[in-house]
């Protein structure tokens, strides 16, 4: 957003227009009117920071209207060089409306810069009652303003710090909410072949729907911590720096001093703690270990590329950053692994790198398959449950899932891919099976230790990852009844595509992530 300096004449003209709009709403609806603007010092009244904070303020007002059962008869908003403006004609007692506005102004970090005037039926503004403190020194604000104690630059800098902090806290909480919502939505998608859903426990005997709910609840703080890890790491490395440094400057410093691999290293101990929290919540059952890794890395990647002015980065930037964070560590550690986990054992036996390799490659299964397929299904009119169930089939048909490989061996994993492909591409299944489902022989136990696992994986991905457009245009949409029948077959064979379930959760998370407020 380009910042533009305005003149005193423009400020006065905008003020007159606001009064005219307020009076017009009062006359038309005969109810109290809220006039919402931002208190921005200096000649620049509209910035990227103020615009994002203003949008958040509107969200808070709408939530307050709903919670208090206030009826909004009219709403108008506009973004001008003189600042953002919003007007609400609210059918409620003016005193109650003012109380709501004061509560928002005082409870929100950004609220110090909110100017939520309430105009009563007599055309007069209701007073706050308690004077607001100065944003720079904390003394009574009117005294500082009348005596010009602080320069406009000082007030502007203090205001920017407030907005940056407020937007960081808001977006950190939003990341946690969206990640938790994605986990709950994923387990709720029904039917899912071999997986826990609302209908049954899939091929599992040690977990059920409530296990996943308990696990998701236990992980709520983890996602926020991952998003904020960059700030925490920077704070440790830069103790003793000038406390007046703005969050924006600190972000620039972080990108210069903390590498992607170092961010990943900082994430690992809190990921281990999240696993312990999950096990404590589920009685020792592993419900979300894969998601703790994958979504945790993504939340950390978002935190690395987040700015208060721009908000969340694009999906491509997030996935590229996740790859940069994990690739170096994977290349160093996986060949030297001690085979303590099932994934490491499968790497030694078949050369498959599992979810760690998928993340290190930038999650191509999500970028090229599941996310475009899911959005295409929604565009075709499917509800989110059906769209997600179909998306899961595309993942099963196109991803080398180590959970399937662990439970069913090469033959079981190949069978699962074939069945999913048959539902999606029945007319050309025989041809597609040869092209997109690697034969069991390609996953035979590795005997040549000189074979490059990464090259082998990339070779398979060229086959397993057809263009999303081809997937969408060439496939049919299986019914929920057909998917439920496949669920029964997976359960009978004790197969569970847990890796694909994690990728579905990632898909739902990224789809819900706003790239701008």
Positions of PLM-derived features:
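Long, contiguous binding/interaction regions
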Residues: 1-64, 96-99, 103-122, 126-168
């Amino acid at each position: 957003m380009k910042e533009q300096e305005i003149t005193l004449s423009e400020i006065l003209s905008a003020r007159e227009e606001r009064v005219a709009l307020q009076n017009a709403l009062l006359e038309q609806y005969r109810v109290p009117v809220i006039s919402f603007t931002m208190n921005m010092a200096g000649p620049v009244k509209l910035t990227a920071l103020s615009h994002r904070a203003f949008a958040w303020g509107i969200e808070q007002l709408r939530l307050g209207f709903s919670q208090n059962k206030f009826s909004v008869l009219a709403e108008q908003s506009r973004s001008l060089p003189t600042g953002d403006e919003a007007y609400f004609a609210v059918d409620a007692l003016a005193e109650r409306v003012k109380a709501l506005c004061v509560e928002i102004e005082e409870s929100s970090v950004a609220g110090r810069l909110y100017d939520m005037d309430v105009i009563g039926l007599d055309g007069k503004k209701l007073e706050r009652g308690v004077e607001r403190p100065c944003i720079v020194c904390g003394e009574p604000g009117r005294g500082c303003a009348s005596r010009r104690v602080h320069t406009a630059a000082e007030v502007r800098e203090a205001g920017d710090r407030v907005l940056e902090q407020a937007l960081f806290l808001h977006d950190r909480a939003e990341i946690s909410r969206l990640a938790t919502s994605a986990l709950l939505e994923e387990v709720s998608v029904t039917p899912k072949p071999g997986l826990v859903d609302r209908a049954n426990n899939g091929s599992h005997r040690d977990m059920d729907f409530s296990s996943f709910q308990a696990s998701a609840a236990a992980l709520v703080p983890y996602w926020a911590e991952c998003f904020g890890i960059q700030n925490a790491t920077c704070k440790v490395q830069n103790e003793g720096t000038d406390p007046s440094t703005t969050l924006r400057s600190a972000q620039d410093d972080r990108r210069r001093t903390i590498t992607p691999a170092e961010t990943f290293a900082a994430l690992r101990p809190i990921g281990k703690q999240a696993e312990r929290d999950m096990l404590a919540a589920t009685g020792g059952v592993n419900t979300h270990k894969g998601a703790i890794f994958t979504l945790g890395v993504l939340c950390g990647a978002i935190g690395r590329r987040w700015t208060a002015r721009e908000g969340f980065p694009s999906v491509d930037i997030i996935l590229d950053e996740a790859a940069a964070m994990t690739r170096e560590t994977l290349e160093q550690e996986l060949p030297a692994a001690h085979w303590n986990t099932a994934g490491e054992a499968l790497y030694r036996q078949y050369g498959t790198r599992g979810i760690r390799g998928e993340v290190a490659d930038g999650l191509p299964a999500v970028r090229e398959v599941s996310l475009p397929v899911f959005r295409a299904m929604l565009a075709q009119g499917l509800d989110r449950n059906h769209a997600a169930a179909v998306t899961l089939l595309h993942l099963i048909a196109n991803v080398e899932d180590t959970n399937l490989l662990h439970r069913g061996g090469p033959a079981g994993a190949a069978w699962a891919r074939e069945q999913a492909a048959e539902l999606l591409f029945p007319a050309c299944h025989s041809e597609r099976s040869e092209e997109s489902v690697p034969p069991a022989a390609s996953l035979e136990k590795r005997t040549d230790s000189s074979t490059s696992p990464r090259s082998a994986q990339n070779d398979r991905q060229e086959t397993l990852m057809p263009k999303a457009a081809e997937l969408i245009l060439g496939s049919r949409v299986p019914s929920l009844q057909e998917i439920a029948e496949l669920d029964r077959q997976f359960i009978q064979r004790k197969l569970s595509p847990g890796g694909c379930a994690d990728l579905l959760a990632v898909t739902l998370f990224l789809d819900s992530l706003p790239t701008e407020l």
